Amino acid sequence: MNLKNAIFGGSVTGISDRSGAYDGSIQAWLPIKDIVQGVVVTRDKRFVKILELLPVNFYTMSSMDKSAAIEDFAAYLKIAPANLQINVLTQPFDLDGYLKLLRGYLERETNEQCRLMLEESMDYVPQLVEREALTHRFFLSFSYDPSMKAPDHTPEAIAAVLNEKAEVARRYLDRCGVAVLEPEYADNFILELFYKLINKHTSQHLRLPDGVFDMLGMVHGVYDEEALKALDTAAAESAGKKKRKWFSRKEASPLSRLEAGATTIPDLIAPPDIDTHHPDYLLIDGVCHAYLYISGYGYSTVVGKGWLTPLIEAGEGVSLSFYLVKQPREKTVNAIGQTTMINRSRMRDVGDTRQDFEELGDAIGAGLYLKEGMNREGQDFYYMHTLIEVIADDPDTLEQRVTAEETLCVAS
Protein backbone atom coordinates (compact mmCIF):
# COMPACT_ATOMS: atom_id res chain seq x y z
CA MET A 1 0.00 0.00 0.00
CA ASN A 2 1.40 3.44 -0.93
CA LEU A 3 1.15 6.65 1.10
CA LYS A 4 -1.72 8.02 -0.96
CA ASN A 5 -3.86 4.94 -0.34
CA ALA A 6 -3.02 4.97 3.37
CA ILE A 7 -4.19 8.58 3.73
CA PHE A 8 -7.10 8.80 1.31
CA GLY A 9 -8.33 5.22 1.34
CA GLY A 10 -7.33 4.14 -2.15
CA SER A 11 -9.63 2.41 -4.59
CA VAL A 12 -11.77 -0.61 -3.89
CA THR A 13 -10.54 -3.89 -5.33
CA GLY A 14 -12.13 -7.26 -5.82
CA ILE A 15 -15.64 -6.12 -6.75
CA SER A 16 -17.31 -8.96 -8.62
CA ASP A 17 -19.08 -8.14 -11.86
CA ARG A 18 -22.58 -9.33 -11.04
CA SER A 19 -24.10 -6.27 -12.71
CA GLY A 20 -23.16 -6.65 -16.35
CA ALA A 21 -25.54 -4.78 -18.63
CA TYR A 22 -25.61 -3.72 -22.24
CA ASP A 23 -25.54 0.00 -23.05
CA GLY A 24 -29.03 1.44 -23.35
CA SER A 25 -30.68 -1.38 -21.42
CA ILE A 26 -32.89 -0.93 -18.37
CA GLN A 27 -30.32 -2.81 -16.28
CA ALA A 28 -27.65 -0.25 -17.21
CA TRP A 29 -29.98 2.56 -16.08
CA LEU A 30 -30.15 1.16 -12.54
CA PRO A 31 -27.42 2.43 -10.16
CA ILE A 32 -27.15 -0.85 -8.21
CA LYS A 33 -24.21 -3.14 -8.99
CA ASP A 34 -24.17 -5.84 -6.32
CA ILE A 35 -25.21 -6.78 -2.77
CA VAL A 36 -22.47 -7.99 -0.41
CA GLN A 37 -23.18 -9.07 3.20
CA GLY A 38 -26.29 -6.89 3.40
CA VAL A 39 -24.52 -3.86 1.85
CA VAL A 40 -25.49 -2.30 -1.48
CA VAL A 41 -22.66 -1.70 -3.97
CA THR A 42 -23.43 0.99 -6.56
CA ARG A 43 -22.00 1.35 -10.03
CA ASP A 44 -19.79 4.25 -8.93
CA LYS A 45 -18.30 1.98 -6.22
CA ARG A 46 -20.13 3.42 -3.23
CA PHE A 47 -21.15 1.11 -0.39
CA VAL A 48 -24.47 1.78 1.34
CA LYS A 49 -25.95 0.12 4.44
CA ILE A 50 -29.74 0.19 4.84
CA LEU A 51 -31.60 -0.37 8.12
CA GLU A 52 -35.37 -0.64 8.51
CA LEU A 53 -36.73 1.04 11.63
CA LEU A 54 -39.85 0.45 13.70
CA PRO A 55 -40.84 3.97 14.80
CA VAL A 56 -42.28 5.08 18.12
CA ASN A 57 -45.43 7.23 18.36
CA PHE A 58 -43.91 10.54 19.39
CA TYR A 59 -47.22 12.11 20.42
CA THR A 60 -48.01 9.41 22.98
CA MET A 61 -44.73 10.01 24.84
CA SER A 62 -44.48 12.22 27.90
CA SER A 63 -42.63 15.54 27.69
CA MET A 64 -39.70 14.05 29.57
CA ASP A 65 -39.51 11.04 27.24
CA LYS A 66 -39.72 13.30 24.17
CA SER A 67 -36.81 15.41 25.37
CA ALA A 68 -34.80 12.28 26.24
CA ALA A 69 -35.44 10.77 22.79
CA ILE A 70 -34.28 13.97 21.07
CA GLU A 71 -31.15 14.13 23.21
CA ASP A 72 -30.33 10.48 22.52
CA PHE A 73 -30.74 11.00 18.78
CA ALA A 74 -28.54 14.10 18.96
CA ALA A 75 -25.93 11.98 20.75
CA TYR A 76 -26.04 9.47 17.89
CA LEU A 77 -25.53 12.23 15.32
CA LYS A 78 -22.24 13.13 17.01
CA ILE A 79 -20.75 9.72 16.22
CA ALA A 80 -22.82 8.84 13.13
CA PRO A 81 -21.36 8.66 9.61
CA ALA A 82 -21.03 11.99 7.83
CA ASN A 83 -23.75 11.18 5.27
CA LEU A 84 -27.11 9.93 6.52
CA GLN A 85 -30.37 9.38 4.69
CA ILE A 86 -33.79 8.87 6.32
CA ASN A 87 -36.53 7.52 4.06
CA VAL A 88 -40.24 7.40 4.81
CA LEU A 89 -41.98 5.09 2.35
CA THR A 90 -45.77 5.29 2.08
CA GLN A 91 -47.44 2.29 0.47
CA PRO A 92 -50.72 0.38 0.56
CA PHE A 93 -51.11 -1.93 3.50
CA ASP A 94 -49.55 -5.38 2.92
CA LEU A 95 -52.55 -7.52 3.80
CA ASP A 96 -51.01 -10.86 2.81
CA GLY A 97 -47.90 -10.28 4.90
CA TYR A 98 -49.89 -9.17 7.93
CA LEU A 99 -52.30 -12.11 7.73
CA LYS A 100 -49.33 -14.47 7.41
CA LEU A 101 -47.89 -12.95 10.58
CA LEU A 102 -51.19 -13.39 12.43
CA ARG A 103 -51.47 -17.01 11.29
CA GLY A 104 -48.03 -17.67 12.74
CA TYR A 105 -49.12 -16.16 16.07
CA LEU A 106 -52.32 -18.21 15.95
CA GLU A 107 -50.44 -21.48 15.45
CA ARG A 108 -48.22 -20.81 18.48
CA GLU A 109 -50.93 -19.39 20.76
CA THR A 110 -52.31 -21.73 23.43
CA ASN A 111 -54.69 -19.38 25.26
CA GLU A 112 -58.20 -19.77 23.85
CA GLN A 113 -59.20 -16.14 24.48
CA CYS A 114 -56.10 -14.87 22.70
CA ARG A 115 -56.83 -17.18 19.79
CA LEU A 116 -60.32 -15.68 19.50
CA MET A 117 -58.84 -12.17 19.46
CA LEU A 118 -56.42 -13.13 16.70
CA GLU A 119 -59.21 -14.68 14.63
CA GLU A 120 -61.31 -11.53 15.04
CA SER A 121 -58.37 -9.42 13.90
CA MET A 122 -57.92 -11.62 10.83
CA ASP A 123 -61.58 -11.03 9.94
CA TYR A 124 -61.53 -7.28 10.64
CA VAL A 125 -58.26 -6.24 8.98
CA PRO A 126 -59.45 -6.94 5.38
CA GLN A 127 -62.30 -4.50 5.96
CA LEU A 128 -59.78 -1.76 6.79
CA VAL A 129 -57.83 -2.46 3.63
CA GLU A 130 -60.98 -1.88 1.57
CA ARG A 131 -60.92 1.72 2.88
CA GLU A 132 -57.47 2.31 1.39
CA ALA A 133 -55.44 1.69 4.52
CA LEU A 134 -51.83 2.88 4.25
CA THR A 135 -48.66 1.91 6.01
CA HIS A 136 -45.35 3.72 6.52
CA ARG A 137 -41.93 2.12 6.41
CA PHE A 138 -38.92 3.96 7.81
CA PHE A 139 -35.32 3.42 6.71
CA LEU A 140 -31.95 4.76 7.80
CA SER A 141 -29.05 4.45 5.38
CA PHE A 142 -25.45 5.60 5.35
CA SER A 143 -22.49 5.13 3.04
CA TYR A 144 -18.86 4.22 3.50
CA ASP A 145 -16.27 6.98 3.51
CA PRO A 146 -12.45 6.75 3.77
CA SER A 147 -12.48 8.00 7.37
CA MET A 148 -13.98 4.64 8.43
CA LYS A 149 -10.67 2.99 7.45
CA ALA A 150 -11.45 -0.58 6.47
CA PRO A 151 -8.49 -2.99 7.01
CA ASP A 152 -8.21 -3.49 3.25
CA HIS A 153 -10.09 -2.15 0.28
CA THR A 154 -12.22 -5.18 -0.50
CA PRO A 155 -16.03 -5.30 -0.54
CA GLU A 156 -16.07 -7.81 2.32
CA ALA A 157 -13.89 -5.61 4.59
CA ILE A 158 -15.95 -2.51 3.82
CA ALA A 159 -19.19 -4.40 4.42
CA ALA A 160 -17.86 -5.56 7.80
CA VAL A 161 -17.11 -1.95 8.80
CA LEU A 162 -20.58 -0.80 7.75
CA ASN A 163 -22.19 -3.65 9.68
CA GLU A 164 -20.28 -2.51 12.78
CA LYS A 165 -21.62 1.01 12.23
CA ALA A 166 -25.10 -0.50 11.97
CA GLU A 167 -24.69 -2.14 15.38
CA VAL A 168 -23.72 1.23 16.88
CA ALA A 169 -26.79 2.83 15.31
CA ARG A 170 -28.96 0.02 16.67
CA ARG A 171 -27.78 0.66 20.24
CA TYR A 172 -28.32 4.42 20.09
CA LEU A 173 -31.71 4.18 18.38
CA ASP A 174 -32.84 1.64 20.95
CA ARG A 175 -32.29 4.30 23.61
CA CYS A 176 -34.64 6.55 21.60
CA GLY A 177 -37.32 3.86 21.64
CA VAL A 178 -36.80 3.04 17.95
CA ALA A 179 -36.27 -0.63 17.14
CA VAL A 180 -34.14 -1.78 14.19
CA LEU A 181 -35.36 -4.82 12.28
CA GLU A 182 -32.88 -7.69 11.97
CA PRO A 183 -33.74 -9.76 8.88
CA GLU A 184 -32.65 -13.38 8.90
CA TYR A 185 -31.08 -13.04 5.45
CA ALA A 186 -29.86 -9.48 4.90
CA ASP A 187 -29.05 -9.92 1.20
CA ASN A 188 -32.51 -11.26 0.42
CA PHE A 189 -34.07 -8.41 2.42
CA ILE A 190 -32.19 -5.75 0.43
CA LEU A 191 -32.95 -7.44 -2.89
CA GLU A 192 -36.67 -7.73 -2.15
CA LEU A 193 -36.78 -4.13 -0.88
CA PHE A 194 -35.38 -2.71 -4.12
CA TYR A 195 -37.56 -5.02 -6.19
CA LYS A 196 -40.67 -3.59 -4.51
CA LEU A 197 -39.42 0.00 -4.69
CA ILE A 198 -38.71 -0.16 -8.41
CA ASN A 199 -41.50 -2.51 -9.53
CA LYS A 200 -44.47 -0.98 -7.73
CA HIS A 201 -47.07 -2.62 -9.99
CA THR A 202 -45.34 -5.89 -10.85
CA SER A 203 -44.42 -6.66 -7.23
CA GLN A 204 -48.10 -6.68 -6.24
CA HIS A 205 -48.81 -9.84 -8.23
CA LEU A 206 -45.35 -11.28 -8.89
CA ARG A 207 -43.01 -11.94 -5.96
CA LEU A 208 -39.38 -12.96 -6.03
CA PRO A 209 -38.98 -16.71 -5.45
CA ASP A 210 -37.41 -18.13 -2.31
CA GLY A 211 -33.67 -18.59 -2.58
CA VAL A 212 -33.49 -15.98 -5.32
CA PHE A 213 -29.73 -15.53 -4.82
CA ASP A 214 -29.23 -19.05 -6.20
CA MET A 215 -30.25 -17.61 -9.57
CA LEU A 216 -27.06 -15.52 -9.75
CA GLY A 217 -25.06 -18.00 -11.80
CA MET A 218 -23.59 -18.39 -15.26
CA VAL A 219 -26.77 -20.07 -16.41
CA HIS A 220 -29.75 -20.46 -14.10
CA GLY A 221 -29.72 -23.95 -12.65
CA VAL A 222 -25.99 -24.50 -13.27
CA TYR A 223 -23.70 -23.56 -10.37
CA ASP A 224 -20.05 -24.12 -11.26
CA GLU A 225 -18.08 -22.09 -8.71
CA GLU A 226 -14.74 -22.96 -10.30
CA ALA A 227 -15.93 -21.65 -13.66
CA LEU A 228 -17.12 -18.44 -12.02
CA LYS A 229 -13.79 -17.89 -10.27
CA ALA A 230 -11.82 -18.60 -13.43
CA LEU A 231 -13.99 -16.18 -15.40
CA ASP A 232 -13.63 -13.39 -12.82
CA THR A 233 -9.86 -13.91 -12.63
CA ALA A 234 -9.47 -13.82 -16.39
CA ALA A 235 -11.57 -10.66 -16.66
CA ALA A 236 -9.56 -8.92 -13.92
CA GLU A 237 -6.24 -9.86 -15.51
CA SER A 238 -7.44 -8.62 -18.88
CA ALA A 239 -8.53 -5.27 -17.41
CA GLY A 240 -5.20 -4.82 -15.59
CA LYS A 241 -2.86 -5.55 -18.48
CA LYS A 242 -1.05 -2.70 -20.14
CA LYS A 243 -1.65 -1.74 -23.74
CA ARG A 244 -0.07 -4.29 -26.08
CA LYS A 245 2.48 -3.37 -28.70
CA TRP A 246 1.30 -3.30 -32.29
CA PHE A 247 3.31 -6.38 -33.25
CA SER A 248 2.06 -8.49 -30.30
CA ARG A 249 -0.17 -11.40 -31.01
CA LYS A 250 -3.72 -10.45 -30.15
CA GLU A 251 -5.44 -12.94 -27.89
CA ALA A 252 -9.17 -13.43 -27.69
CA SER A 253 -10.62 -11.44 -24.80
CA PRO A 254 -12.42 -13.51 -22.19
CA LEU A 255 -16.18 -13.41 -22.05
CA SER A 256 -17.76 -11.24 -19.42
CA ARG A 257 -20.28 -12.80 -17.08
CA LEU A 258 -22.98 -10.97 -19.00
CA GLU A 259 -21.87 -12.45 -22.32
CA ALA A 260 -21.56 -15.87 -20.71
CA GLY A 261 -25.24 -15.81 -19.77
CA ALA A 262 -25.04 -14.88 -16.09
CA THR A 263 -28.11 -13.71 -14.20
CA THR A 264 -27.25 -10.46 -12.42
CA ILE A 265 -28.65 -8.35 -9.58
CA PRO A 266 -30.03 -5.71 -12.01
CA ASP A 267 -31.72 -8.51 -13.96
CA LEU A 268 -33.73 -9.44 -10.88
CA ILE A 269 -34.84 -5.93 -9.89
CA ALA A 270 -35.14 -4.24 -13.31
CA PRO A 271 -38.68 -3.04 -14.17
CA PRO A 272 -40.42 -4.18 -17.36
CA ASP A 273 -40.29 -0.67 -18.86
CA ILE A 274 -38.98 2.85 -18.23
CA ASP A 275 -39.99 6.07 -20.01
CA THR A 276 -37.87 9.17 -19.25
CA HIS A 277 -39.06 11.40 -22.10
CA HIS A 278 -41.83 13.30 -20.29
CA PRO A 279 -40.63 16.61 -18.78
CA ASP A 280 -42.78 16.39 -15.64
CA TYR A 281 -42.46 12.80 -14.48
CA LEU A 282 -40.81 9.40 -14.93
CA LEU A 283 -42.85 6.40 -15.98
CA ILE A 284 -41.46 3.27 -14.30
CA ASP A 285 -43.34 -0.03 -14.39
CA GLY A 286 -46.50 1.82 -15.43
CA VAL A 287 -46.36 4.20 -12.43
CA CYS A 288 -45.79 7.96 -12.77
CA HIS A 289 -43.08 9.39 -10.49
CA ALA A 290 -42.64 13.13 -9.79
CA TYR A 291 -40.18 14.73 -7.38
CA LEU A 292 -40.26 17.95 -5.34
CA TYR A 293 -37.29 19.54 -3.60
CA ILE A 294 -37.66 21.94 -0.67
CA SER A 295 -35.36 24.90 -1.25
CA GLY A 296 -33.12 26.39 1.43
CA TYR A 297 -35.54 29.19 2.29
CA GLY A 298 -38.52 26.84 2.30
CA TYR A 299 -38.03 25.79 5.94
CA SER A 300 -39.49 27.62 8.90
CA THR A 301 -36.94 29.49 11.02
CA VAL A 302 -38.36 28.14 14.28
CA VAL A 303 -39.96 24.69 14.45
CA GLY A 304 -41.36 22.54 17.23
CA LYS A 305 -41.22 18.87 18.07
CA GLY A 306 -42.65 16.65 15.35
CA TRP A 307 -42.65 19.47 12.78
CA LEU A 308 -42.26 17.08 9.84
CA THR A 309 -45.34 15.03 10.72
CA PRO A 310 -47.67 16.84 8.24
CA LEU A 311 -45.38 15.87 5.36
CA ILE A 312 -45.04 12.28 6.54
CA GLU A 313 -48.82 11.94 6.90
CA ALA A 314 -49.53 13.59 3.53
CA GLY A 315 -51.38 10.53 2.25
CA GLU A 316 -51.25 7.93 -0.48
CA GLY A 317 -48.46 8.10 -3.00
CA VAL A 318 -46.24 10.54 -1.08
CA SER A 319 -42.85 9.41 0.26
CA LEU A 320 -40.04 11.47 1.78
CA SER A 321 -36.26 11.36 1.82
CA PHE A 322 -34.17 13.43 4.23
CA TYR A 323 -30.44 13.80 3.57
CA LEU A 324 -28.15 14.89 6.40
CA VAL A 325 -24.59 15.88 5.51
CA LYS A 326 -22.20 16.71 8.37
CA GLN A 327 -19.76 19.55 7.73
CA PRO A 328 -16.19 19.74 9.13
CA ARG A 329 -16.28 21.65 12.43
CA GLU A 330 -13.16 23.83 12.06
CA LYS A 331 -13.87 24.76 8.47
CA THR A 332 -17.49 25.62 9.27
CA VAL A 333 -16.69 27.73 12.35
CA ASN A 334 -14.09 29.72 10.40
CA ALA A 335 -16.50 30.31 7.51
CA ILE A 336 -19.28 31.44 9.87
CA GLY A 337 -16.88 33.78 11.70
CA GLN A 338 -15.65 35.39 8.49
CA THR A 339 -19.18 35.84 7.14
CA THR A 340 -20.38 37.37 10.42
CA MET A 341 -17.44 39.78 10.46
CA ILE A 342 -18.17 40.88 6.88
CA ASN A 343 -21.85 41.40 7.69
CA ARG A 344 -20.94 43.52 10.71
CA SER A 345 -18.71 45.75 8.59
CA ARG A 346 -21.49 46.13 6.03
CA MET A 347 -23.95 46.95 8.82
CA ARG A 348 -22.06 50.17 9.60
CA ASP A 349 -22.69 51.48 6.10
CA VAL A 350 -26.36 50.52 5.92
CA GLY A 351 -29.00 52.90 7.20
CA ASP A 352 -31.85 51.60 9.35
CA THR A 353 -34.33 52.67 6.67
CA ARG A 354 -32.90 50.44 3.97
CA GLN A 355 -34.66 47.22 3.05
CA ASP A 356 -31.66 44.97 3.74
CA PHE A 357 -31.01 46.37 7.23
CA GLU A 358 -33.16 43.70 8.93
CA GLU A 359 -31.71 40.99 6.70
CA LEU A 360 -28.17 41.85 7.74
CA GLY A 361 -29.21 41.95 11.39
CA ASP A 362 -30.81 38.51 11.11
CA ALA A 363 -27.72 37.13 9.36
CA ILE A 364 -25.44 38.43 12.12
CA GLY A 365 -27.70 36.98 14.82
CA ALA A 366 -27.82 33.61 13.05
CA GLY A 367 -24.03 33.53 12.74
CA LEU A 368 -23.53 34.27 16.43
CA TYR A 369 -26.12 31.63 17.34
CA LEU A 370 -24.35 28.98 15.24
CA LYS A 371 -20.92 29.86 16.61
CA GLU A 372 -22.14 29.66 20.20
CA GLY A 373 -23.76 26.28 19.63
CA MET A 374 -20.68 24.80 17.98
CA ASN A 375 -18.04 26.32 20.28
CA ARG A 376 -19.72 26.20 23.68
CA GLU A 377 -22.22 23.36 23.37
CA GLY A 378 -20.24 21.05 21.10
CA GLN A 379 -22.94 20.84 18.43
CA ASP A 380 -22.29 19.82 14.83
CA PHE A 381 -23.33 21.61 11.67
CA TYR A 382 -25.44 19.65 9.19
CA TYR A 383 -26.89 20.47 5.82
CA MET A 384 -30.38 19.01 5.41
CA HIS A 385 -32.01 18.28 2.06
CA THR A 386 -35.62 17.14 1.66
CA LEU A 387 -36.84 15.29 -1.43
CA ILE A 388 -40.54 14.45 -1.85
CA GLU A 389 -41.57 11.61 -4.16
CA VAL A 390 -45.13 11.65 -5.51
CA ILE A 391 -46.48 8.67 -7.46
CA ALA A 392 -49.76 7.89 -9.19
CA ASP A 393 -51.15 5.49 -11.76
CA ASP A 394 -51.98 8.24 -14.29
CA PRO A 395 -50.74 11.78 -15.07
CA ASP A 396 -53.96 13.52 -13.99
CA THR A 397 -53.93 11.97 -10.52
CA LEU A 398 -50.22 12.72 -10.27
CA GLU A 399 -50.79 16.40 -11.05
CA GLN A 400 -53.51 16.61 -8.39
CA ARG A 401 -51.26 15.04 -5.76
CA VAL A 402 -48.31 17.28 -6.65
CA THR A 403 -50.50 20.38 -6.36
CA ALA A 404 -51.85 19.22 -2.99
CA GLU A 405 -48.33 18.55 -1.74
CA GLU A 406 -47.11 21.99 -2.83
CA THR A 407 -50.03 23.58 -0.99
CA LEU A 408 -49.23 21.56 2.12
CA CYS A 409 -45.58 22.65 2.02
CA VAL A 410 -46.60 26.32 1.80
CA ALA A 411 -49.07 25.93 4.68
CA SER A 412 -46.51 24.13 6.87
Name each region found by the language model.
Residues 2-412:
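Extended, folded cores of ATP/NTP-driven motor/assembly subunits in large transport
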